[in-house]
């Protein structure tokens, strides 16, 4: 059993290119072992380039897990092996749930349950889409509503919620720079 570790859950919200992912990576640079859960699926050339750019910006010693749908399960499976898990991002997770016609509420509830007592600290990245233009199509409005509901649910269980604007963090809940410290194994006496 590892000791001297207090798991925190931090939700980073912001618009497109607001600095969310970069800020999340800064958490990882202060942690020991990091698992990066990527929810995006490279479905076209533009997305492949974006995934490749994000992958190349991460330290090589981070473990990457590509998981578009089973995010709660990834926390349970990979969380015990790391000090910090970065989930980037809930925006693609929500889109993947809609595409898969998955039960959205069960998925949100499962994620929030996993975050209530995670085996490691968790940083989640998500877009804040509620401040933009109302989408023209029903599917766009459904996506906006689902992501808004997911963000609210995760924010309720998170220790810290930050809004990134132009790369600058604004504290909505908790601390500006939550502590993410490596777990310490107990000393074995000889």
Language model segments and positions:
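Helix-adjacent hinge/juxtasegments
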Residues: 60-106
């Amino acid at each position: 059993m590892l000791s001297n570790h207090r798991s925190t859950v931090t939700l980073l919200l912001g618009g497109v290119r607001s600095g969310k992912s970069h800020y999340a990576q800064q958490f990882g640079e202060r942690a020991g072992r990091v698992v990066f859960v990527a929810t995006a699926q490279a479905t076209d050339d533009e997305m492949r380039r974006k995934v490749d750019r994000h992958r190349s910006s991460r330290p090589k010693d981070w473990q990457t897990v590509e998981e578009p749908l089973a995010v709660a399960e990834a926390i349970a499976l990979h969380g015990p092996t790391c000090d910090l898990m970065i989930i980037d991002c809930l925006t693609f997770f929500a889109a993947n749930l809609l595409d898969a016609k998955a039960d959205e509420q069960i998925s949100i509830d499962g994620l929030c349950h996993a975050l209530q007592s995670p085996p490691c600290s968790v940083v989640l990245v998500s877009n804040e889409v509620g401040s933009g233009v109302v989408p023209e199509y029903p599917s766009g409005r459904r996506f906006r509503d689902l992501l808004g509901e997911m963000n609210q649910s995760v924010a309720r269980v998170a220790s810290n919620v930050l809004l990134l604007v132009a790369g600058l963090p604004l504290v909505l809940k908790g601390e500006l720079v939550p502590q993410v410290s490596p777990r310490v194994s107990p000393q074995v006496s000889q």
